Amino acid sequence: MVTYKDAGVDIYKEDKVIRALASQIKFERNDAIKPADLKGHYAGAIEFGDYYLVLCTDGVGSKMVVAEMANKFDTVPIDMIAMNVNDAICIGAEPVALVDYMAVEDITEDIASQIGKGLNDGIKESNINLIGGETASLPNMIKGVDLAGTVLAVVKKDEIVSGKEVKPGDLIVGLRSSGIHSNGLSLARKVFFDIANLDVNSKLSHGKTVAEELLTPTKIYVKPVLEMIKQVNVKGLAHITGGGFRKLKRLNKEVCYKIDELPEILPIFKEIQNLGSVADEEMFKTFNMGIGFCVIVDKEDAEKIIEISNHHNIPAFVIGKIEDSVELNGETKRETVLVEYNNKKMIME
């Protein structure tokens, strides 16, 4: 059975590397501009009067490799923007501006135009301004193109959504993803291109080509989630990216997140699992599995969240609930994420 680690990505090693880096960051300004207490959350924030200024930075990862293989670059900028704005809204902040960074080996005007179109589509869907950026020609350092960006968002101090209010009895509403989004591409490429010997134009069993599936842009959840925050007492928000539902532990770490009512898994994930003989646990630790964003609310507010999401043409479902503890093989587990799928219970550590 192939794993994400076999494809060159070790998420546990990445966690250790991040901790090693963060352990050396000790300086902090000694004035009124102080960081918010959001350690380990989706975004960082600093005080600015009655507001927090929120910053997120991210890129598109190896999805760009598929774009180069297909010679199609107009969707990956949407992914880059989505990865940033979807993180920013996890603390209730409204994204307002973006700066981008593009590193290139060499680039044509056609590719630049495609990237520009994608940037425009992404900022329009997110309702943000692109206010600057940098393009670096680095022929001796990289091959192809890499694209990243940083988003600025704002939130009133008394409106921040930290996840600390999440408690047993709350429901988890899952918002449908558009597909693979921007995580797990290394494993997907290994399965499709190395194991199954397909190419970007190969048709999968459900009719779409490999390129169509892998280059479908990440869903941008800004508009529905900001509307939810205005209308409902939202307790926790989670962008389901690398690591899958493990991301829920970025919220209240003292409870259990039980995912036991998942909707039908999207075809792209079935294709990857079947062609690569990937274990259920590995799939759920690598991919979003059809749920790109989670909203945690009181039981009585779940239907309103689903209604708002559906209004924005994003299917939504109650996929689980918050519990004090969960049972697995006769053992009581606390402070964890439990996923039930295919009559199997899996702890997402």
UniProtKB/Swiss-Prot annotation:
Gene Ontology terms: biological process: 'de novo' IMP biosynthetic process; adenine biosynthetic process
Major localisation: cytoplasm
Q: What does the record give as its pathway? A: Purine metabolism; IMP biosynthesis via de novo pathway; 5-amino-1-(5-phospho-D-ribosyl)imidazole from N(2)-formyl-N(1)-(5-phospho-D-ribosyl)glycinamide: step 2/2
The UniProt entry, under Pfam families, shows:
AIRS, AIRS_C
Q: Which keywords accompany this UniProt record?
A: ATP-binding, Cytoplasm, Ligase, Nucleotide-binding, Purine biosynthesis
Reaction(s) catalysed (UniProt annotation): 2-formamido-N(1)-(5-O-phospho-beta-D-ribosyl)acetamidine + ATP = 5-amino-1-(5-phospho-beta-D-ribosyl)imidazole + ADP + phosphate + H(+)
| Localisation | Cytoplasm
Gene3D superfamilies linked to this entry: PurM-like C-terminal domain (3.90.650.10), PurM-like, N-terminal domain (3.30.1330.10)
Q: What is its EC number?
A: 6.3.3.1
GO cellular component assignments: cytosol
The cross-references to InterPro entries, in alphabetical order and at most eight, read: PurM-like_C_dom, PurM-like_C_sf, PurM-like_N, PurM-like_N_sf, PurM_cligase
Which Gene Ontology terms cover its molecular function? ATP binding; phosphoribosylamine-glycine ligase activity; phosphoribosylformylglycinamidine cyclo-ligase activity
Please give the family membership noted in the entry.
Belongs to the AIR synthase family.
Q: Which PANTHER family match?
A: TRIFUNCTIONAL PURINE BIOSYNTHETIC PROTEIN ADENOSINE-3 (PTHR10520:SF12), TRIFUNCTIONAL PURINE BIOSYNTHETIC PROTEIN ADENOSINE-3-RELATED (PTHR10520)
HAMAP family for this protein? AIRS
Q: What is the name of this protein?
A: Phosphoribosylformylglycinamidine cyclo-ligase
Per the record, the gene is: purM
